[in-house]
Curated annotation (Swiss-Prot):
InterPro entries given in the database record: Ribosomal_uL10 (IPR001790), Ribosomal_uL10-like_sf (IPR043141), Ribosomal_uL10_bac (IPR022973), Ribosomal_uL10_bac_type (IPR047865), Ribosomal_uL10_CS_bac (IPR002363)
Organismal lineage: Bacteria, Pseudomonadati, Thermodesulfobacteriota, Desulfovibrionia, Desulfovibrionales
Protein name, UniProt field: Large ribosomal subunit protein uL10
CDD domains: Ribosomal_L10
Natural source organism: Desulfovibrio desulfuricans (strain ATCC 27774 / DSM 6949 / MB)
Subunit organization: Part of the ribosomal stalk of the 50S ribosomal subunit. The N-terminus interacts with L11 and the large rRNA to form the base of the stalk. The C-terminus forms an elongated spine to which L12 dimers bind in a sequential fashion forming a multimeric L10(L12)X complex.
Length: 174
């Protein structure tokens, strides 16, 4: 690989790393191209991307960036998964894939500049996703006006029954 090609690869990795809030190092030794393609597809759906790069180029690209804390972990066959939107979705996709494939291993991760171990990645994968949390938040926010309307309707219903009772008393008295 020529020096200019190396510089282009470093810049591409650096650009992706700067955009990503989450980076996971994985061991992919012995995996087939088809398995890696399936992994890339599931990560794409989760808002992530998977790269297989030379370790020295990745170390250079991650130096002085958000994911600087994991740059020294590049050894042997390491792939990098970047998460751009929802780290939980990417962690779930990687964790699920690791359970399916005996050859695929999670090594470590960086979340907003903080190093994570495998157990922490698995814990992150068990959290509810962004969509679930937003749905729960909207449900909670919707509960207050719904309860208010229900309470107001009950008060009005009670008032109507009271007025109806008074009307019946007056019609019986007359």
């Amino acid at each position: 690989m020529k020096r200019s090609e190396k510089a282009a690869v470093i810049e591409a990795i650096k650009a992706k790393a700067d955009k990503a809030s989450f980076a996971v190092l994985t061991d992919f030794k012995g995996m087939t191209v088809e398995e890696l393609t399936n992994l890339r597809g599931s990560l794409r759906k989760a808002g992530g991307e998977y790269l297989v790069v030379k370790n020295t180029l990745a170390r250079i690209a991650l130096t002085d960036g958000t994911h600087d804390v994991i740059k020294d972990k590049f050894r042997e066959n390491i792939g990098v998964a970047f998460g751009f939107d929802d780290p939980v979705a990417v962690a779930k996709a990687l964790s699920d894939f690791a359970k399916q494939s005996k050859l695929f291993e999670l090594r470590c991760a960086s979340l907003d500049g903080k190093a994570l171990e495998v157990a922490q990645i698995d814990a992150l994968a068990k959290l509810p996703g962004r969509e679930q949390l937003l749905g729960h938040l909207l449900g909670t926010m919707n509960a207050v006006p719904t309860n208010f309307v229900s309470l107001f309707a009950n008060v009005l219903r009670g008032l109507l029954y009271a007025l109806k009772g008074i009307e019946e008393q007056k019609s019986n008295a007359a």
